[in-house]
Amino acid sequence: MTKADTIFKENIECILKEGVFSEQARPKYKDGTVANSKYVTGAFSEYDLSKGEFPITTLRPIAIKSAIKEVLWIYQDQSNSLEVLNDKYNVHYWNDWEVGDTGTIGERYGAVVKKHDIINKLLKQLETNPWNRRNIISLWDYQAFEETDGLLPCAFQTMFDVRRVDGEIYLDATLTQRSNDMLVAHHINAMQYVALQMMIAKHFGWKVGKFFYFINNLHIYDNQFEQAQELLRREPSNCQPRLVLNVPDGTNFFDIKAEDFELVDYDPVKPQLKFDLAI
């Protein structure tokens, strides 16, 4: 069993046994009913990517390519346009969060990255002094939240540090997430930011190091308990999945494409489970 599968099952069991139910919940299912959830607070996990530990479960298939394309939309295109996401990347799951008829998700994610020139500033800081303790991406912008409607960012802060070990520089990353749908989005979000970490490491010719993942509110929606039990019953696949970025060291961050990533030794348990999403 991979480390990710162990953590996945432990988190599911913890939520089901020790979690509490939400109150005054904002999300709704497509039929208009309130989407309550059972949750725990302060969930933390750690993966050493340099040792082949990746935060992706084998207990069900994870759509890794779409997840990586979303990261490119946010940090390369620096866009909030659904047209860009749909037409350039053929990714459509954000359409349910369109703000009115704007064709956007509001001033969120990529729009905030562009507004503050976040990724260019980060790369410049890492180039100038990678050992400084201020290499942070933050998508939490109160002014933007007041200016437009839209879903507030779930994965909103990423911090980066470097370590020199045996002459090699390793890039570590810490992702902080305010809210996470454990069964649907947990491994998607984690692998998205592992991909971002790998892109930045490649830009500088560094090794990928450790990935730390903190979630403030980790939950299972009240229409997912049957799927949760099914995941607990499943035996994990006998594989060791890992994400590979097939570009040379020193490849410019903005030149990396979704097709450059390869998920190897990944044979997840099937069939896929179905989930009705909360919007």
UniProtKB/Swiss-Prot annotation:
- What top-tier enzyme class does this entry carry? transferase
Name of the featured protein: Thymidylate synthase
Q: Where in the cell does this protein reside?
A: Cytoplasm
Pathway(s) served: Pyrimidine metabolism; dTTP biosynthesis
Tell me which EC number(s) this protein carries: 2.1.1.45
Residue positions annotated to bind dUMP are R133, R134, R178, S179, N180, D181, N189, H219, I220, Y221
Q: Which Pfam families match?
A: Thymidylat_synt
User: What residues make up the catalytic site?
Assistant: C154 (nucleophile)
Entry's family note: Belongs to the thymidylate synthase family. Bacterial-type ThyA subfamily.
Q: Tell me the classification of the organism that encodes this protein.
A: Bacteria, Bacillati, Bacillota, Bacilli, Lactobacillales
Q: Which keywords belong to this entry?
A: Cytoplasm, Methyltransferase, Nucleotide biosynthesis, Transferase
- Catalyses which reaction(s): dUMP + (6R)-5,10-methylene-5,6,7,8-tetrahydrofolate = 7,8-dihydrofolate + dTMP
Quote the cellular component terms of the Gene Ontology held in the record.
cytosol
The function of this protein is: Catalyzes the reductive methylation of 2'-deoxyuridine-5'-monophosphate (dUMP) to 2'-deoxythymidine-5'-monophosphate (dTMP) while utilizing 5,10-methylenetetrahydrofolate (mTHF) as the methyl donor and reductant in the reaction, yielding dihydrofolate (DHF) as a by-product. This enzymatic reaction provides an intracellular de novo source of dTMP, an essential precursor for DNA biosynthesis.
Q: Which GO terms describe its molecular function?
A: thymidylate synthase activity
- This protein's species is Streptococcus pneumoniae (strain ATCC 700669 / Spain 23F-1)
